[in-house]
Curated annotation (Swiss-Prot):
Function: Involved in protein export. Acts as a chaperone by maintaining the newly synthesized protein in an open conformation. Functions as a peptidyl-prolyl cis-trans isomerase.
InterPro entries: PPIase_dom_sf (IPR046357), PPIase_FKBP_dom (IPR001179), Trig_fac (IPR005215), Trigger_fac_C (IPR008880), Trigger_fac_C_sf (IPR037041), Trigger_fac_ribosome-bd_bac (IPR008881), Trigger_fac_ribosome-bd_sf (IPR036611), Trigger_fact/SurA_dom_sf (IPR027304)
Primary location group: cytoplasm
Annotated organism of origin: Pseudomonas syringae pv. tomato (strain ATCC BAA-871 / DC3000)
A Pfam family the protein falls into: FKBP_C
Gene that this sequence comes from: tig
Catalysed reactions listed for this entry: [protein]-peptidylproline (omega=180) = [protein]-peptidylproline (omega=0)
Protein name in the entry: Trigger factor
Length: 436
């Protein structure tokens, strides 16, 4: 077998492969012999059909099958011989083939980039620490109460946080517009569900009252036909209902499936959940900084095939998450390219760190992570048992643990600053923290 390789770009390879005619004929004959053993042809006993008849009837098909298998086999033999690491399936172009002569074809494909991860000492990480204070716990209990609020009709003027039942009709330039009208819809004042000025304009309204609201759609409104335009809404208030927060009692506690009884038992369980959330938030923020640092210190070119595969995965995830009748390939690739590029780059860099430092998933950390995840459920023992019976889930946990070990390896070499903050700041999402 003859092989030559041309580097057509940083990652693309054009490999020309020649397969000797003798090897082709051997494969063709092997298939014809297999066919002869089971072929049923009128006038001949099974297994006794002359090879000339078999060849006349089946040679073309056997040759096509043999060529396909040989191209696949010789391609992988060639990449092993040339010490190449393909990042995707090759595009195959036959150059010449005649019966009885050598086969020559060209395989064009991308390879994984070869690089060494460096720049660990240029990575700066701010590692937060925090505790769950009693005041944080009190605030969380209020959040839980508000999440379970119920509303009772009140005979008074509407205030912020009241729930109104309203009918409304909106007009732009004196014309009713699509989606601008509704009847008997519920609206909590101050929720920010409606465009600016709408909810504020209903503060002080009473049941049975009609109000005319003059508002303006935001410039970045999702409906471009309405963005930036003035509108007039005629609103009729059907009912005004005031919020009633539930009492912290056994009935309330049961909604959360907490076995402990009494307010102190409930507070203890909520605190455990908050502490678990705190640990995860701090760990996630450290990981994000490490990954950002690795990307900045190690710019690499990534194979287009990997990017396309990741874009397609993200498309499928988007359809599964948001539903609808749209097909994944109908979503524009541009929506996912930036995220896909980051994922692919990080995947390659993390894999290289694992290789450079010969990292293996730590069994003790795997057990610890499973216990941590199981502790969030009512029957943690059953959850732990389920993980250990499910090899796919176990492999996913091992992957997460290995990624954490990569983070730990980087932290040993990076510049790390510890900072004590409040619980609220520690669990605040990264984007929200940047906005502040």
């Amino acid at each position: 077998m003859q092989v030559s390789v041309e580097n057509t770009s940083a990652l693309e390879r054009r490999m020309t492969i020649g397969v000797p005619a003798e090897r082709i004929e051997t494969e063709v004959n092997k298939r014809l012999q297999q066919t002869a053993r089971k072929a049923k042809i009128p006038g001949f006993r099974p297994g006794k059909v002359p090879m000339s008849v078999i060849r006349q009837r089946y040679e073309d098909g056997a040759r096509q099958e043999a060529l396909g298998d040989l191209i696949q086999a010789t391609f992988y033999e060639a990449v092993v011989e040339q010490k190449l690491n393909p990042a995707g399936a090759p595009a195959v172009e036959p150059k010449s083939f005649e019966k009885g002569k050598d086969l020559e074809y060209v395989a064009t494909f991308e390879v994984f980039p070869e690089f060494t991860v460096a720049g660990f000492d240029t990575i700066a990480v701010e590692r937060l620490s925090a505790d769950v204070a009693d005041s944080d716990l009190d605030n969380m209990l209020e959040v839980l109460r508000k999440q379970n609020v119920r509303f009772e009709v009140a005979d008074r003027a509407a205030q912020n946080e009241d729930q109104l039942n309203i009918d409304f009709e909106g007009k732009v330039d004196g014309e009713v517009f699509a989606g601008g009208s509704a009847t008997a819809t519920q609206l909590v004042l101050g929720s920010g569900r409606m465009i600016p000025g709408f909810e504020d304009g209903l503060v002080g309204a009473k049941a049975g009252e009609e109000r005319v609201l003059n508002v303006t759609f935001p410039e970045d409104y999702q409906n471009l036909d309405l963005a930036g335009k003035a509108a007039e809404f005629t609103v009729t208030v059907n009912t005004v209902s005031e919020p009633k927060l539930p009492e912290l009692n056994e009935e309330f506690f049961k909604q959360f499936g907490i076995k402990e009884t009494g307010i102190e038992g409930f507070r203890t369980e909520v605190r455990k959940n908050m502490e678990r959330e705190l640990r995860q938030a701090i760990k996630s923020k450290v990981k994000n900084q490490v990954m950002d640092g690795l990307l900045a210190a190690n710019p690499i070119e990534v194979p287009k095939a990997l990017l396309e595969n990741e874009v397609n995965r993200l498309r499928v995830q988007a359809v599964q998450q948001f539903g609808g009748n749209i097909k994944p390939d109908q979503l524009p690739a541009e929506l996912f390219e930036e995220q896909a590029k980051r994922r692919v780059e990080l995947g390659l860099i993390v894999a290289e760190v694992v290789k450079q430092f010969d990292l293996k998933p730590d069994d003790a950390r795997v057990r610890e992570m499973i216990q941590e995840m199981a502790s969030a459920y009512q029957e943690p023992e059953q959850v732990v048992a389920w993980y250990y019976k499910n090899e796919q889930q176990m492999n996913e946990v091992r992957s997460v643990v290995l990624e954490e070990q990569v983070v730990d390896t980087v932290l040993q070499k990076a510049s790390v600053t510890d900072k004590s903050v409040s619980y609220e700041e520690a669990v605040k999402p990264v984007e929200a923290a940047k906005a502040d």
